[in-house]
Amino acid sequence: CIRDSLIVSPVSLKSTVLNLIDEEIKKGENGRIFVKINSLTDAEIIDKLSQASCAGVKVRMVIRGICCLLPGIPNKTGNIEISSIVGRYLEHSRIYCFGTGADEKMYISSADFMTRNTERRVEVACPVYDEKLRAKIHAIMDVVLCDNVKARLLTPEGVYVKKERTEPRLDSQEFLMEQAEKFADE
């Protein structure tokens, strides 16, 4: 039953996320984490992501707003890459992926990784099981990670810098809006 699979804060969301990160830590260099959220301020999650990085886990995050983790610091967050996309649209989608292939656990959620969201608000993360939906979410992740127009990379110094512009130019928000319009016309 899908209801039994939901992770809900303040009851189980934070502990589940921490456990999922621990699972990736056990995989070491084969571990993978992708997170798309608006804010990252929860100290326990930040510490656990740093542990994952030190274990060799590759962590890619797209965080639109507040981010209290500095990526790329040797022996601390060297395996973490963080980008931010601020464009025409306010981002509301939140995606968490842990692992790869058949072992990947994917969630869509209402929760940012902020203490107020993980401990004091009612928020939900829903696992994604349907292969077609998973493929669509992976396609969205790929587009967001390839944005070379609006995306900015967070440096170890806490400065956001433009991603190197390559061809073809890709504004992820515009591209995804065009895709949504095409889908609506079908």
Residue ranges and their predicted role:
Residues S9-E186:
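PLD/PLD-like phosphodiesterase catalytic module centered on the HKD motif
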